[in-house]
Amino acid sequence: MKSIEVVAAIIIYENKILCLQRGENKYDYISKKYEFPGGKMELGETKEQTIKREIHEELNMHIDVEKEFITVIHQYPDFILTMHSFICKCDNPILKLTEHIDSKWLKVNELENLDWAEADIPIMQRLMSCQF
């Protein structure tokens, strides 16, 4: 089975967290699900560099990476995903969607109301147990 390693940004602005909705996908089980933004590392990149690049490419935002949060290993039907999540901050919540179909800035206690991609659920649950 194919393995994919990615990074994800938990972007916080004024005590709200950015949640993005994926578009249509060849894999039904992640199509139109919410997720934390991020992507795959390029050769020679650190995880922090990858997050900054991906967020700039996908959202036209600049972020500060504060600290590593949790790593999730999730087996989907077609691949195994290892996702390293990081707490990030931004100074400006304005973004431009280039790959996603919706964005929401939510308080921690509102996160569970979204239909999350399965690999992102452990991150969402851990966030709900934290104080921001």
Q: Which residues fall in each region the model found?
A:
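NUDIX/MutT-family hydrolases
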Residues: 87, 96-127
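Active-site-adjacent beta-strand/loop module that shapes the phosphate/pyrophosphate-binding cleft
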Residues: 62, 72-94, 104
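Short secondary-structure junctions
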Residues: 58-65
